[in-house]
């Protein structure tokens, strides 16, 4: 809808250049756990806004709190200026933006937030879209602590965790990319393992596609180790993942609540 409205405004301006344009804010919030595709969608977002005529380039510059913090007075302002110049014509994505929520008055995060507010209020900075990314609840705390930010980011997108079926689909695509394949028993063992991990996940920190990537990396290493120790008789089996290659997941321990059970 945001892209459509932007494209419509462009068409309207081309046909009736004398009309005053309604400015559409491109600044957005991407909220969700790691591995839910926020960075990927941000790149698509930039490309679509470029195609719609809202951004002159559509590229994405990714940064975080550490990008802006220095050791000398004024480092934050210099870093912000440099990053904004790099992102001109595209999208400035600030990952884990909730870390800008300073816990005390001297926290440099407060300076960065104020510099960001100044950027958003600058009418000359129209050829840039700022996207703040992070976990939902910490991001809400950032917005509550800095109410001026909320009005500057009218576009809110929430990224839900992938389902078990979606995680298995991600797995299939990743292994096909490298020509690996599972035996029937190995796939069953893997799917049971992912389903169990999903049911026991911490919904606030679950890694989603990143979790799958990490598990596959462990499987690849185990598979390679096995093949070196016992080379397959058939060269086609060099890419065949067996049950022995499926490395068990260390299940996270659930936090015990303080108090007495009834």
Question: How would you describe each model-predicted region?
Answer:
Residues 207-229:
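C-terminal helical "lid" of AAA+/P-loop NTPase domains
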Residues 65-75, 99-110, 156-158:
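Flexible beta-alpha connector loops of hexameric P-loop NTPases
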Residues 19-58, 85, 153:
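Walker A/P-loop
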Residues 52-57, 141-145, 150, 159-205, ...:
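Conserved C-terminal "switch" segment of AAA+ ATPases
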Residues 222-262:
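C-terminal engagement/docking regions of AAA+ P-loop ATPases
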Residues 98-131, 137, 144-150:
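Conserved catalytic/switch belt of AAA+ P-loop NTPases
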Residues 58-87:
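Short glycine-rich substrate-engagement loop in P-loop NTPases that contacts/grips substrate
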Residues 1-26:
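Pre-Walker A (pre-P-loop) alpha-helix and adjacent loop at the N terminus of AAA/AAA+ ATPase modules
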């Amino acid at each position: 809808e945001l892209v459509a409205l932007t494209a419509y405004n462009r068409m309207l301006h081309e046909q009736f250049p004398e009309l005053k344009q309604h400015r559409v804010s491109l600044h957005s919030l991407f909220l969700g756990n790691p591995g839910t595709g926020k960075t990927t969608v941000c790149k698509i977002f930039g490309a679509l806004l470029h195609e719609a005529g809202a951004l002159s380039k559509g590229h994405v510059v990714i940064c975080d709190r550490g990008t802006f913090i220095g050791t000398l007075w004024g480092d934050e302002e210099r870093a912000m200026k440099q990053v904004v110049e790099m992102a001109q014509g595209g999208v400035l994505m600030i990952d884990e933006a909730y870390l800008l929520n300073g816990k005390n008055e001297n926290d440099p995060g407060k300076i960065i937030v104020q510099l960001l507010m100044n950027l958003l209020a600058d009418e000359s900075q129209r050829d840039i879209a700022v996207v703040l990314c992070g976990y939902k609840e910490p991001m809400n705390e950032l917005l509550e602590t800095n109410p001026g930010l909320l009005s500057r980011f009218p576009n809110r997108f929430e990224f839900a965790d992938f389902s078990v079926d979606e995680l298995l689909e991600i797995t299939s695509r990743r292994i096909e990319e490298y020509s690996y394949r599972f035996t029937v028993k190995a796939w069953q063992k893997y799917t049971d393992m992912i389903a169990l991990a999903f049911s026991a996940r911490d919904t606030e920190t679950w890694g989603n596609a990143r979790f799958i990537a990490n598990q596959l990396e462990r499987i690849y290493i185990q598979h390679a180790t096995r093949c070196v120790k016992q080379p397959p008789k058939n060269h086609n089996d060099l890419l065949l993942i067996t049950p022995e290659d499926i490395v068990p997941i260390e299940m996270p321990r659930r936090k015990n609540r303080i108090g007495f059970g009834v």
